């Protein structure tokens, strides 16, 4: 974590947590959501909420939304790594050399139009399944539920090494002012253009249901396909905003660049203090 040119590691953050809670700006660089990382974030964010005097229900929805946004960022980075691998396999087919395929891959990954076009050649369910496998294996390690097989260890090690190789991080910035508590979550992978459009459409439909007094209906089975393809995690965050009387379309913004995706979440201090 960096703040005013001070960098602290996890154990140091916990030791200094009472002083840190009084600061107005934080910048954390995350590799994943390990239990120690979750504990640090819980202590820090809930400490800030206590300092603000936030309603416990509002605090619950805020922290749940933040964890969901960070999990989305982690999944996006993993998905990007797996997409790269699958695309490289496609490019190596035929008489293309490994070196030529890798050079072409870099050109594609740096060009949004080419990168988006290549999605049609990669089976989405295959990528999704591998992402879920990575998350499942990480969870088994975290909870010590199961000893991984050799093939599982190799697969997970390969993904981890590529995340390190391509320096795929998650940046979390927290800022507190008199008016609002805001978060900026940035991961090192762009959103596919069509996925971005579907997310926006999905959020609008969710808002329409909320306006009708039925926002929870968005999570019924008839919306299953939309949840899977258009940002179920974002829908969960939006629902948290609705639950505390706030409009997420005004307070949660998603932007995507050539190499990154950024989520901005803003919570008015007055809204966090309200009784529900």
Write out the residue ranges for each language-model feature.
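Conserved, well-structured beta-alpha core segment at the onset of a catalytic domain
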Residues: 1-89, 245-276
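Residue-level detector of functional hotspots within protein domains
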Residues: 14-16, 48, 156-160, 237
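Glycine-rich/acidic phosphate-handling loop/turn and adjacent ATP-lid/helix
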Residues: 86-231
């Amino acid at each position: 974590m960096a703040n005013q040119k001070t960098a602290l590691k996890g154990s140091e953050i916990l030791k200094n947590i009472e002083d840190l809670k009084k600061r107005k700006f934080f910048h954390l660089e995350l590799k994943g959501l390990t239990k120690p990382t979750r504990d640090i974030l819980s202590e820090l964010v809930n400490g800030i909420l206590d300092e603000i005097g936030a309603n416990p229900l509002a605090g619950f929805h805020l922290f749940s939304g933040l964890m969901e946004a960070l999990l989305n960022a982690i999944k996006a980075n993993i998905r990007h790594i797996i997409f790269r691998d699958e695309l490289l396999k496609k490019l190596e087919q035929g008489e293309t050399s490994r070196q030529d395929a890798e050079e072409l891959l870099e050109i594609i990954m740096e060009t949004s139009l080419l990168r988006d076009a290549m999605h049609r050649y990669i089976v989405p369910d295959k990528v999704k399944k591998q992402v879920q496998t990575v998350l499942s294996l990480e969870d088994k390690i975290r909870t010590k539920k199961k000893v991984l097989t050799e093939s599982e260890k190799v697969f997970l090690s390969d993904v981890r090494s590529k995340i390190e190789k391509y320096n795929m991080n998650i940046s979390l910035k927290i800022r507190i002012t008199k008016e609002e508590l805001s978060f900026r979550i940035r991961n090192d992978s762009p959103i596919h253009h069509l996925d971005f459009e579907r997310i926006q459409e999905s959020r609008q439909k969710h808002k329409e249901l909320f306006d009708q007094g039925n926002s929870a209906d968005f999570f019924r089975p008839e919306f299953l396909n939309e949840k899977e393809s258009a940002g179920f995690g974002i829908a969960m965050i939006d629902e948290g905003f609705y639950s505390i009387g706030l409009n997420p379309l005004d307070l949660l913004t998603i932007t995507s660049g050539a190499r990154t995706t950024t989520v901005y979440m803003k919570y008015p201090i007055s809204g966090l203090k309200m009784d529900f």
